[in-house]
Amino acid sequence: MSLNRVLHIFLIAYLACTALTHDFDDTIAVVGAGYSGLSAAFTLVKKGYTNVEIYESQGEVGGYVYSVDYNNVAHDLATYALTPAYWKFQEAMKSIGVGFCELDVAIVQTNSTPVSVPFEKWMAAYWAAKVPNPLNLVRKVSTQVSTYVEVWKKLFNMDFIDTSTKRTNRLFPLKTNDVDVLAQFSMPMKDFVALHKLDLLEPLFIQATDSQAYGPYDTTPALYYMVWFPPNLFNGEENTVPCGTYNSMQSMAEHMAEWLKSKGVTFHMNTKVTKISRATDGSSPSLLEEGVATPKLFDTIISTNKLPSANRAEVVTPLLPKEREAADTYEELQMFSALLETNRSDAIPTTGFLMVDADAIIAHDPNTGFWGCLNAERRGGYSDENAILSSDTVTRVSAIYYYTERANNERIDFSLDEKIQQVKTNLATWDSATWTNLTSRTFGGYFQRWRTPDVMGQKPWNLADIQGEGDVYYVNSAACGFESVGHVFDCADNLIKDFF
């Protein structure tokens, strides 16, 4: 395949990194020093790459999603603590000499009395869970979810904005003295595990709330975050945690950053980001930088008028969840634009890889020769992906379908023609045979969007609408994507090489 075609491959950042061959000499840039970026850089370093740079606009590591007010007291929480992403991050920390006490999960119950469940046992149950027939499961728990939505509304304040950063907090704070309302609802662990495993939590909440305005962070906080992590989660004896005692996710991320620096990874902190403005007449927003021309690629994208007008850091009134999702993407577009500027001393080379967040598009711009990555889909699918895919510069898209079945860790082989035909004929069905092969989260929200709208409560995408002039295939777009991680890396390595 010619490199003159814009190649968009939906991959998690570190998965894309690991697919590269070791003779790739260009700079590999990672945008964002949160868990996604640190994990990407860590994987690259472990695989022997020495040309890694991390760009962070906010000037600190660890991200902004790890704290929440609990009864008006700030606690450190982990957005991904119930997922393989955090689990693998901890494994990465252990591999560089950081020890951990056994992690206990404290489940908030009536009167906030915690019941400890060993984290390892929870994870073991997660992986071992049998996935029932999805349709029966949906019918079984839809009433429960509807009930839980009401509980969730009582527990979480959707209008919360962090006054120090003006950022909308993705983990909504519990209202004072409302913790015991959790006693009004309970879901059997096996049902919760099955829903989580099938990536059905978000669609069920959408169905229950009769709205598509809620993104994944907003629709499932009570299910995801009914598990409460006490502030001393990472505390331990000095001999148990040889590299120091970690009392927060932030400090652990900082330690990872220091380790990466010791291995030669360059951090560009407080990287200048282009500003966003909207014309007073309400026309399309634009990216502006004094004395710097905005790259054509982003002029095209922004001209679609599908993205919000305000930088999230400047938001002073609550955004709808959909706008919050798009604002995240918009920030990353700003960063991408800034890094493409050739007259800035900290600009990365015009050839290289740019990794943005956990779900991303790897892009090659034939006009500049730049290989990069746009975060368009945003896990939940509410930033208008079509707006980006239909823009003039990135219309020619081609990628690969790939699927790993988590239960047996075996690759399911399809030629591209067979796979695209399967998408067209089978994804609208909900029969057991289809689900036997499609139970992994590795396709994440993208795969679910093609399901039947009457069951999922969502309008399925029309594949033809997003094909543009090329073909659109999806690859392993999990929210976290660590399932069968070694196997996926090996397969991705072979698949990417096919394009080079």
From Swiss-Prot:
Its job: Involved in the biosynthesis of conjugated triene-containing fatty acids. Catalyzes the isomerization of a wide range of substrates containing three or more methylene interrupted olefins into a Z,E,E conjugated triene functionality. May be involved in a stress tolerance mechanism as response to intertidal habitats with direct sunlight, desiccation and high temperature.
Reactions catalysed according to its record: (5Z,8Z,11Z,14Z,17Z)-eicosapentaenoate = (5Z,7E,9E,14Z,17Z)-icosapentaenoate
Quaternary structure, from the entry: Homodimer.
Pfam families in UniProt: Amino_oxidase
Signal sequence, renumbered to the chain: 1-21
UniProt enzyme class: isomerase
InterPro entries registered for this protein in UniProt: Amino_oxidase (IPR002937), FAD/NAD-bd_sf (IPR036188), Zeta_carotene_desat/Oxidored (IPR050464)
PTM entry text: Glycosylated.
Enzyme Commission designation: 5.3.3.13
Molecular-function GO term, any one: oxidoreductase activity
PANTHER family linked: PROTOPORPHYRINOGEN OXIDASE (PTHR42923)
Keyword Transcription: no
Descriptive protein name: Polyenoic fatty acid isomerase
